[in-house]
Amino acid sequence: MSQLYTRPEFRRIAGEHWRPGGTEITDRLLALGRRWHDAGPEGRILDVGCGPGGSVRHLRQQGRQVWGLDTVLRPQWRAGTPAEAGVLPYLVADACAGLPLRDSVLDMILCECVLSVLPDTAAFLREARRVLRPGGLLACSDLYRRGEEGILVPQPAGCAAGARSRADWTALCEEAGFAVRHFEDASPALARLAAALVWYGARQSLREWGLCGPGCGGAEARPGYALWIAQKEE
């Protein structure tokens, strides 16, 4: 089963933000981050799993120093994102195999609906810690399991397969050397996007997400959406 963001009908409905909440969630993450590590507009941000670059363009329009990273070159990167010295602010790399950056160079890493689809989340979190400056932040939004503890098992290839409970997301971050400073439920954003998919006739996309009810584990899992801030500990 393919990941949800690869489906044309999902991209058509979600636009340039392949996740719940769009820029509202992005802005919320940055606002929360300022409580623990305010590097100002000059702070360096990397958007891992940036997709078509919607968050990169949004934050650069605010004057932020932000770059995007994804596993493939996206044609949308050239649209609406001014190049600096002829170079677009994007990198192509496998985030789990190694980020193409020196140690301690970033103030924040954005992971918006990314951790749950990574093949090796622990390896990525170790890399994230390496490239963040002391006190730097990992700002995440992702699917999480609001019901029983543990990873969703009925949907082994959909986006919801990697969703974890709050306790499990926290434990993963702590094992990699982060302290989770804030965690909040943002499930209404997930509900709005799910409703849009149904309204526009993309019900199959709900199955990709693991939100199709008891047949794929949706009812038992109570999948929700959350955002959290984790800080690099020394």
Feature annotation, model-predicted:
Residues R19-G40:
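Conserved alpha-helix/loop element of class I SAM-dependent methyltransferases that forms part
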Residues P52-A97:
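Class I SAM-dependent methyltransferase SAM/SAH-binding core
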Residues A97-M108:
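A short acidic, Gly/Pro-enriched loop at the edge of an enzyme's catalytic core
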Residues M108-P119:
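A short SAM/SAH-binding and catalytic strip from SAM-dependent methyltransferases
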Residues A122-L137:
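A short glycine-rich, Lys/Arg-flanked "PGG" loop and its adjoining helix->strand segment in the class I
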Residues L143-A160:
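Short, glycine-/aromatic-enriched active-site segment of Class I SAM-dependent methyltransferases
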Residues G162-A176:
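Short alpha-helix
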Residues E184-E234:
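Conserved Class I S-adenosyl-L-methionine
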